Amino acid sequence: MMTSCRNIDLGTMMMACGCGRRQFPSLAKTVCKFTSSNRSYGGLVGSCKAVPTKSKEISLLNGIGQSQTVSFDLKQESKQPISLVTLFELVAVDLQTLNDNLLSIVGAENPVLISAAEQIFGAGGKRMRPGLVFLVSHATAELAGLKELTTEHRRLAEIIEMIHTASLIHDDVLDESDMRRGKETVHELFGTRVAVLAGDFMFAQASWYLANLENLEVIKLISQVIKDFASGEIKQASSLFDCDTKLDEYLLKSFYKTASLVAASTKGAAIFSRVEPDVTEQMYEFGKNLGLSFQIVDDILDFTQSTEQLGKPAGSDLAKGNLTAPVIFALEREPRLREIIESEFCEAGSLEEAIEAVTKGGGIKRAQELAREKADDAIKNLQCLPRSGFRSALEDMVLYNLERID
């Protein structure tokens, strides 16, 4: 894989294309090339060539003129593990305001609905989706010359978290989950009927606030996400224990269930910054690739982490017949795995045998490569943004996800 970038303004700070060096404070143009054998951003090896501002780009392309070259291996750099606390430091105030507003925004008059909302919001959560909205909002606002975030940026983050929360309530009902983030789920506390109504109410309330943004492009974008949620659930339900499920079908289902909301979040943030359409599209692709990478990593962890780490039994997706990337890859090399799955684990110990076959058949390794491939694509999508702390935080979000399987 080769990524090339030309004619990048350096100023006095950092270079683009993932090169955060300060070696060239008086130079203004670079050609950066990165190569990778394993397609992982963390494994990129590259070099940057910088020339004085007065040199013309054509001389760079032809290798003419005075220049100096610095080679570096990003894989060799020592870097502390990325935590969510440090990841969202730049938008901590924005996220605190969002947390303070969430319950009042739900605004339910029915005490049961209020209790349900308090249960799900009070359970905490990483607030990753609104965090992404704020990071992209700040990064693109800089590009558009905005001094601060708009009311629309902030309302979008709140709407996204409400939609995500509503989807979790419904997911817990469908999956019959009794715990969420260490707390009892809404349907476990209040019953299935109240949980379904609470999720419906939150979707409706989010839609009302969405309509009040009065931006048709964003309204269509977010409305499509709600449709995608349903499409993803139907796709999953109709393909349980189906060993002929293709990787493309898995990725489409993962887009519907996970990446669609992330992509809409990042694109919506860019739209409200009023940047050029090509930038908003790159932000959509960034969200899509990041969302897919996250889902693939989650599906890997279902096999590699313990029940205590997962908060649910290991291999629980497989046990329900939900075939994810590691299983799809392993099925190509392990005929016995097909037999076990199609029997729906009717024999004692068959689930444990299937989990072992997934690892033995190279399913975990190939799924890791796929997650890194999507991560690489996400990093490339960010190259349209000016180098800033906010862009660096978005890059770190990609790396944070990959660190979960390193």
Swiss-Prot record:
Domain of life of the organism encoding this protein: Eukaryota
Binding site for an all-trans-polyprenyl diphosphate: R180, K257, T258, Q295, K312
GO cellular-component term (any): chloroplast
Transit peptide: 1-71
CDD domains: Trans_IPPS_HT
Cofactor note: Binds 2 Mg(2+) ions per subunit.
Subcellular location: Plastid, Chloroplast
Sequence positions that bind isopentenyl diphosphate: K126, R129, H164, R181
Transmembrane segments: none
Induction details: Induced by high light conditions.
GO annotation terms (biological process): isoprenoid biosynthetic process; plastoquinone biosynthetic process
pH dependence (record): Optimum pH is 8.0.
Main location: plastid
InterPro entries: Isoprenoid_synthase_dom_sf, Polyprenyl_synt, Polyprenyl_synt_CS
Catalyzed reactions per annotation: 5 isopentenyl diphosphate + (2E,6E,10E)-geranylgeranyl diphosphate = all-trans-nonaprenyl diphosphate + 5 diphosphate; isopentenyl diphosphate + (2E,6E)-farnesyl diphosphate = (2E,6E,10E)-geranylgeranyl diphosphate + diphosphate
Cofactor section: Mg(2+)
Assembly and oligomerization: Homodimer. Interacts with FBN5.
Family: Belongs to the FPP/GGPP synthase family.
Record's protein name: Solanesyl diphosphate synthase 1, chloroplastic
Provenance organism: Arabidopsis thaliana (Mouse-ear cress)
Name of encoding gene: SPS1
